[in-house]
From Swiss-Prot:
PANTHER family: TYROSINE--TRNA LIGASE, MITOCHONDRIAL, TYROSYL-TRNA SYNTHETASE. Pfam families: tRNA-synt_1b. A motif ('KMSKS' region) lies at residues 230-234. It catalyses: tRNA(Tyr) + L-tyrosine + ATP = L-tyrosyl-tRNA(Tyr) + AMP + diphosphate + H(+). This is Tyrosine--tRNA ligase. Its EC number is 6.1.1.1. It is an enzyme of class 6 (ligase). It comes from the Bacteria. ATP binds at K233. Keywords: Aminoacyl-tRNA synthetase, ATP-binding, Cytoplasm, Ligase, Nucleotide-binding, Protein biosynthesis, RNA-binding. The keyword DNA-binding does not apply. It is found in: Cytoplasm. InterPro entries: aa-tRNA-synth_Ic, Rossmann-like_a/b/a_fold, S4_RNA-bd_sf, Tyr-tRNA-ligase, Tyr-tRNA-ligase_bac-type, Tyr-tRNA-ligase_bac_1.
Length: 412
């Protein structure tokens, strides 16, 4: 359908929209005035990664179009653990861990949003809610028959995977969050990933049973690449939005190196470039598409880390990859004593984090994919010794494939 609301029309045009409840009614409300909406983040890590970037972009669009976003931090629900999309029970976190994670997540979110965003912790109302009172007042309004049909529950049980009562009850807590946010802030819209659909609909149903007016829900699609795999992680781990956990340089490189087929979609999702410009960029072919990837990488990095940092890392990357400036390579030090009489390059690639195993290093060398100081390594048993460093000014430049590059400086 065509939306009158700028917010929903943008979601539809840029590929954010997966499911929504009562589209016509929600569109009418959002096109006639400001709406309060919330997105929740449990505090399971001390940062968010790009798997949460769609939700963060929607918070930005809510602000842009004059609506009122609420960021809900799960200080209480983190203690329980959402089973949605998980194959096993999450590890229990201590109060100190949750508190530290909450601070880290908040620090990330504030980079993306203006200062007037409302931030709330559901521990404010769930933390002191008595167990028996909660069961009587909230639990009585849920049907176990319906709960067993939730995808988060059904998928675990169908695979004969353990689901604790703690996780089973998570939907009650998230549902009550929606009710409480409506009471306190007049919130009528909850936004989440597609795995949150069951929890969102349950919250709408609970609100109706507790006498609230009609509430609404919107979900975004899973973040998948063109081959159908989840995006958000590399061999080195998650693509964190905190610069201390994942450098702006690596962040830029990640988006610069996405598959050709993903460029247009990621430009729509993670940049604020006009759609007409995105259509022009995604129509580029061959080598020209690399320019679109650079624009994508710089635009995404600018939103996360700031325009000045984005320009710096773009220039740094271009010096390394297009002008072979070794001074701009990521640098590590390596002990002369450790190197001794020489170590096989295949082993060093693993030690330096460039390959996941020694055998992977050997395969790379056999395929001609490893260069040391510009020369292709042909012998998978070749040793690297101190002379290789001394003959090159005290360092070696290691290139693995097209993307992994490292400057290793020898120290006494």
């Amino acid at each position: 359908m065509e939306f009158n609301s700028e917010f929903l029309a943008t979601l539809c045009a840029r590929g954010y929209l997966h499911q929504l409840t009562d589209a016509t009614a929600l569109d009418g409300i959002m096109s006639s005035g400001a709406v309060t909406a919330y997105i929740g983040f449990d505090c399971t890590a001390n940062s968010l990664h790009i798997g949460s970037l769609m939700q963060i972009m929607l918070l930005r669009y809510l602000q842009r179009f004059g609506h009122k976003p609420i960021v809900l931090l799960g200080g209480a629900t983190t203690k329980v653990g959402d089973p949605s999309g998980k194959e096993k029970t999450r590890a229990m976190l201590s109060e100190d861990n949750i508190s530290a994670n909450k601070e880290g997540i908040l620090r990330v979110i504030k980079k993306f949003l203006s200062e007037d965003v409302v931030v709330v912790d559901n521990a404010e109302w769930l933390g002191n809610y008595g167990y028996l009172d909660f069961l009587r007042e909230i639990g009585s309004k849920f049907s176990v028959n319906v709960m067993l049909g939730l995808e988060s529950v059904k998928s675990r049980l169908s695979r004969d995977q353990q689901l604790s009562f703690l996780e089973f009850s998570y939907v009650l807590l998230q549902s009550y969050d929606f009710v409480e946010l409506h009471k306190r802030y007049g919130c009528i819209l909850q936004i989440g990933g597609s795995d949150q659909w069951g929890n969102i609909v349950s919250g709408i149903d609970l609100a109706r049973k507790m006498g609230c007016p009609q509430l609404y829900g919107v979900t975004t699609p899973l973040l998948l690449n063109s081959s159908g795999a989840k995006m958000g992680k590399t061999a080195d781990g998650a693509i964190w939005l905190d610069e201390t956990l994942y450098s702006p340089y690596n962040y830029w490189q990640y988006f610069r190196n996405v598959p050709d087929q993903d460029v247009g979609r990621l430009l729509r999702l993670f940049t604020e470039l006009p759609l007409s410009e995105i259509e022009r960029l995604e129509a580029l072919k061959g080598e020209e598409l690399n320019e679109a990837k650079k624009i994508l990488a710089t635009a995404v990095t600018s939103i996360c880390h700031g325009a000045e940092v984005a320009l710096q890392v773009e220039n740094q990357a271009l010096k390394v990859f297009e002008h072979n400036d070794h001074d701009e390579l990521r640098s590590i030090t390596f002990s002369r004593k450790t190197l001794g009489q020489g170590i096989p390059i295949s082993k060093l690639l693993h030690m330096w984090g460039l390959e996941e195993s020694i055998s992977a290093g050997r395969r790379l060398i056999r395929g001609g994919g490893c260069k040391i100081n510009g020369g292709v390594v042909l012998d998978e048993e070749k040793l690297l010794n101190c002379g290789d460093f001394d003959d090159n000014g005290g360092y070696v430049a290691v290139f693995c494939g097209k993307k992994r590059r490292l400057k290793v400086v020898l120290e006494d």
